[in-house]
Regions:
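Active-site core of glycosidic bond-cleaving carbohydrate-active enzymes
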Residues: 1-205
Length: 205
């Protein structure tokens, strides 16, 4: 079908999009670090098959599908809406696939993935950002406002108003006393995004 197993090669486990995305994320990271196009050439067919598999899994969207869950920002003191995360991950998958297709000279596929990324990004910002305050919200419209939601939005590039999202990340970090309110996915990028937003002292604290 194209789905990647959470445990390879034996199969099993669980995780969904937040684990399966590693197939795309890691291939691009290896290419960026070493510049070896053969990495992308070797794994592109599998990544393309995975993206085809994801087409009917309900993203972008706000309906929970077991095929794309169940894991989010695991072990975080503050829970971030799963659908907010899953849609953000899907955006980054599409965005990276457009870059990978471009690097491989597959122009038509590059444009297809670019269009998908634009569609997901529009949906994410309309669904998970409150228009008045610019704070993040859950799929049901209630307030989310977690460090992870802002850090992911910045790191993955899904936020349209990066300045406003960055300000909320800094505000939230200060509001919880410069403690870590993130889990598996938010922690590694938290200080990076604070620093990127010019809040170096906040990151140190």
């Amino acid at each position: 079908e194209g789905q990647y197993p959470e445990i390879a090669p034996v199969g099993g486990g669980f995780g969904g999009i937040t684990y399966e995305c590693a197939s795309i994320f890691m291939a691009w990271e290896l290419y960026e670090q070493y510049g070896d196009i053969r990495t992308l050439e070797k794994f592109y067919p599998g990544m393309q098959k995975y993206m085809d598999y994801m087409k009917d899994k309900g993203l972008p969207g706000t309906k929970v599908n077991p095929a794309i869950g169940p894991l989010g920002d695991w072990l975080a003191p503050e829970e971030t809406d799963l659908l907010l995360l899953w849609n953000a991950f899907y955006y980054k998958e599409a965005d990276l696939m457009s870059r990978i297709a471009g690097a491989l000279g597959r122009t038509e596929e590059q444009h297809q993935y670019e269009a998908l990324a634009a569609k997901v990004k529009k949906f994410w910002n309309e669904t998970f950002v409150l228009p008045d305050s610019g704070k993040t919200c859950n799929a049901d419209g209630t307030l989310c406002d977690t460090q992870c939601s802002y850090a992911i939005a910045l790191s993955y590039g899904v936020a349209e108003d990066r300045k406003r999202i960055g300000e909320h990340l800094i505000r939230k970090t200060r509001a919880i006393g410069h403690t870590v309110g993130t889990g598996f996915f938010g922690t590694g990028i938290l200080n990076q995004m604070l620093t990127e937003q010019g809040a170096v002292e906040d990151a140190w604290k």
